Structure formats: structure tokens, C-alpha cells
């Protein structure tokens, strides 16, 4: 559930909530990378991942587990370079879902880019603009 944990972090760390639009984007993103996801299996996985997030209690523990999850994804043979770029796109989609880009979202996404050694960059856009990947 490392992928789902990172998707959840992008959404939750910024404003301490996950609205329905963000949850739908998380589902669609997760579904692209994990075969056979149903609404029911997603809700089970999402519940377990949310519980893990809550159980970690502190932001520093949650951040440490985010780092751990990013490294686990990087080392997973299932994820090739192009897949990691697609995951970054999924993070950007989540950040854009609620029409407000939080600094924390930008920081978390840039952190993933750095850990995965991708030649990408993102910058917090001007008010009212969408977050975009710069190559």
C-alpha cells in the first residue's frame, strides 16, 4: 500500500482533509497502477492506509513513512522510470483536484521527484493556475 499511502499524503498533508473530488482522483490514480481494483477493494485499501496514517500520529512520523514509501516504490521492479513519471502526474492531479495548490503539496511532489532521480521540476503556480510539471 506504499503507492496509496503516498497518494493519500499528497491530499491530506496540505489541508488535513480529503474531499470527494480528491478521493475520486486518488481512486482513478490507484486504479491505473494496481490491477483489478474495485470500489470495494479500494475502500478496504483506503481504510487500511488511512488507519496507518492516523496511527502514525505526528507529522514527522507521517513524513518519514512517506519517505519510506517513496523508496519502496523506487525499488519495486514493477515501477519503471516511465511509471514513476506517471505517479508524479497522479500527484499533480491530486494537488489540482481542489483548485487550490498548497505549498506542502508542491514540497511533497518535488521531494518524490528528487528521491526518484527524475529530471522534472514543479513550481507553485500563481493564484488560480494549475500545477504543472516542467521538463
Locations of regions flagged by a protein language model:
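Small-residue-enriched hydrophobic alpha-helices in membranes
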Residues: 1-135
Amino acid at each position: 500500500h506504499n503507492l496509496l499511502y503516498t497518494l493519500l499524503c499528497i491530499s491530506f498533508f496540505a489541508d488535513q482533509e480529503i474531499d470527494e473530488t480528491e478521493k475520486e482522483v486518488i481512486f482513478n490514480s490507484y486504479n491505473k497502477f494496481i490491477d483489478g481494483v474495485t470500489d470495494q477493494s479500494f475502500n478496504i485499501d483506503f481504510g487500511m492506509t488511512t488507519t496507518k496514517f492516523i496511527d502514525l500520529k505526528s507529522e514527522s512520523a507521517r513524513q518519514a513513512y512517506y519517505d519510506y514509501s517513496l523508496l519502496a516504490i523506487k525499488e519495486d521492479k514493477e515501477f519503471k522510470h516511465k511509471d514513476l513519471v506517471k505517479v508524479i502526474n497522479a500527484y499533480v492531479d491530486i494537488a489540482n483536484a481542489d483548485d487550490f495548490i498548497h505549498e506542502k503539496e508542491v514540497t511533497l511532489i518535488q521531494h518524490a521527484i528528487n528521491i526518484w532521480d527524475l529530471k522534472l521540476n514543479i513550481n507553485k503556480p500563481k493564484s488560480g493556475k494549475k500545477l504543472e510539471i516542467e521538463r
